[in-house]
């Protein structure tokens, strides 16, 4: 086997392993917010994804209503947590796992998580509470994905 072939084979295997690990971490961590929404929000996660200017990936402009404002606050919360509690992590805070559970209708963040995990859980808990408090303002026409 030529050294060149061996080198490119190692690079290919390493690249595939890195991508697989990144996808696993992202799937696991984004699952927290997905399942929290699925479990505790009045609407499905799909009804919020792509809603207004801030719900989903990215965000800019003026929120279209109180639901979209919840997403803007959530984006800002993640930004603040990324700079403060999670500042020691190299990767994006959206990829960090945390534990939570339900007690009745209340979301409870695991106090055993580190400061970063607890803060991220609180960001996600707060947006679910905000969604539920403002559910009357939900307008399907603002959902770019399903509306």
From Swiss-Prot:
SUPFAM superfamilies in the record: Phospholipase A2, PLA2
PROSITE patterns, per the entry: PA2_ASP, PA2_HIS
Propeptide: 23-28
Required cofactor names: Ca(2+)
Transmembrane segments: none
Co-factor binding comment: Binds 1 Ca(2+) ion.
Enzyme Commission numbers on file: 3.1.1.4
Claim: Hydrolase is one of the keywords in the record: yes
Keywords on record: Calcium, Disulfide bond, Hydrolase, Lipid degradation, Lipid metabolism, Metal-binding, Secreted, Signal
Expression sites (tissue/organ): Expressed by the venom gland.
Any one GO BP annotation for this protein: phospholipid metabolic process
Active-site residues, Swiss-Prot/TrEMBL: 74, 124
Places the protein is found: Secreted
Disulfides per UniProt: 55-71, 70-130, 77-123, 86-116, 109-121
Entry's Gene Ontology molecular function annotations: calcium ion binding; phospholipase A2 activity
Catalytic activity: a 1,2-diacyl-sn-glycero-3-phosphocholine + H2O = a 1-acyl-sn-glycero-3-phosphocholine + a fatty acid + H(+)
Sites where the protein binds Ca(2+): 56, 58, 75
Record function comment: PLA2 catalyzes the calcium-dependent hydrolysis of the 2-acyl groups in 3-sn-phosphoglycerides.
Family: Belongs to the phospholipase A2 family.
Protein name as it appears in the record: Phospholipase A2 SSD1043
Top-level taxonomy: Eukaryota, Metazoa, Ecdysozoa, Arthropoda, Myriapoda
């Amino acid at each position: 086997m030529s050294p060149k072939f061996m080198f490119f084979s190692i690079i290919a295997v390493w690249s595939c392993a890195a991508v697989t690990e990144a996808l696993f971490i992202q799937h696991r961590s984004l699952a927290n917010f997905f399942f929290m929404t699925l479990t505790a929000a009045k609407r499905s996660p799909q009804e919020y994804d792509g809603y207004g200017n801030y719900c989903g990936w990215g965000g800019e402009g003026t929120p279209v209503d109180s639901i979209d404002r919840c997403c803007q606050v959530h984006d800002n919360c993640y930004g603040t947590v990324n700079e403060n509690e999670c500042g020691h992590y190299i990767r994006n805070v959206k990829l960090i796992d945390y534990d939570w559970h339900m007690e009745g209708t209340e979301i409870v963040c695991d106090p055993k998580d580190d400061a970063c995990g607890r803060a991220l859980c609180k960001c996600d808990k707060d947006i679910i509470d905000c969604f539920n408090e403002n559910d009357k303002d939900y307008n399907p026409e603002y959902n770019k994905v399903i509306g």
